């Protein structure tokens, strides 16, 4: 048997509520990002399968840029950022975990990681109904984890009413320019700028990209590695 590992659109996202303290402070959001060792998280939560991406773009999109090293794991830097943000004595936040493996598998690791820099995390396992009502709709949360799988979905960060609570006129302008671009090159350039701005602002932390894992007999070839939607293409698969 052969194991095939490709990519998907599913960005496992550590959402931070930009609309209220403490995550209305960019320094705190950046501190969270630099407190989490993504490689070790992927090993712990997803058996080592997954791609660090650094922003809200999968590698199958033309505007993808590897931004995973923009804010690298650095405990001392994370502590310094919290001190600069006014949290030298630490802080306490809640992390809402919906009932799905990538979230529940990540909770303890993230809590332990943030504890090392002075952030106490109360883990809150919740049902999907509560997540949709309280977190997604009412935006009553501090942090949460969910996988965003929609194609070309960067526009959700351009909506201040969306549950991330991110309100950047610069970002909104880039998304509008991309949508009205007359050439593909112009669209790609504006979306690259938008993705970098998301990363620069540490709006969320993109923990990893869920891989497309498949197992097939060695006599089978032409397996499509990557998936960008619900369709599964079989016209190039051969046996023998």
Per-segment meaning from a language model:
Residues 6-31, 44, 159-161, 175-176, ...:
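A bilobed periplasmic-binding-protein/Venus flytrap-type ligand-binding module shared by bacterial periplasmic
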Residues 19-28, 70-71, 88, 180-181:
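Short helix-loop capping/hinge motifs at secondary-structure junctions, enriched
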Residues 26, 75-94:
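Immediate post-signal peptide segment of exported/extracytoplasmic ligand-binding proteins
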Residues 33-63, 102-111, 132-240:
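Detector for C-terminal structural segments
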Residues 44-45, 68, 94-101:
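Short beta-strand->loop
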Residues 88-95, 112-126:
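A local structural motif
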Residues 99-101, 123-133:
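Short helix-initiation/N-cap motifs at beta->coil->alpha
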């Amino acid at each position: 048997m052969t194991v095939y590992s490709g990519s998907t659109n599913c960005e496992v996202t550590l959402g931070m509520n930009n609309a209220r303290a403490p995550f209305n402070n960019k320094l705190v959001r950046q501190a969270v990002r630099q407190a989490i060792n993504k490689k070790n998280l992927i090993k712990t939560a997803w058996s080592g399968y997954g791609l660090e991406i650094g922003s809200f773009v999968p590698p199958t999109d033309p505007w993808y840029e590897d931004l995973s090293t923009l804010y690298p794991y650095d405990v001392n830097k994370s502590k310094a950022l919290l001190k600069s943000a006014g949290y030298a004595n630490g802080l306490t936040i809640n992390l809402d975990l919906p009932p799905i493996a990538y979230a529940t598998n990540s909770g303890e690791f993230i809590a332990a990681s943030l504890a090392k820099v002075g952030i106490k995390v109360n883990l809150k396992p919740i049902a999907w109904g509560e997540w949709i009502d309280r977190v997604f709709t009412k935006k009553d949360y501090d942090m949460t984890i969910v996988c965003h799988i929609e194609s070309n979905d960067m526009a959700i960060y351009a909506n201040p009413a969306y549950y991330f609570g991110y309100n950047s006129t610069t970002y909104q302008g880039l998304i509008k320019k991309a949508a009205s671009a007359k050439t593909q090159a112009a669209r790609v350039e504006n979306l690259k700028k938008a993705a970098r701005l998301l990363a620069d602002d540490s709006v969320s932390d993109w923990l990893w990209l869920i891989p497309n894992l498949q197992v097939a007999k060695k006599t089978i070839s032409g397996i499509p590695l990557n998936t960008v939607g619900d369709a599964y293409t079989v016209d190039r698969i051969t046996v023998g």
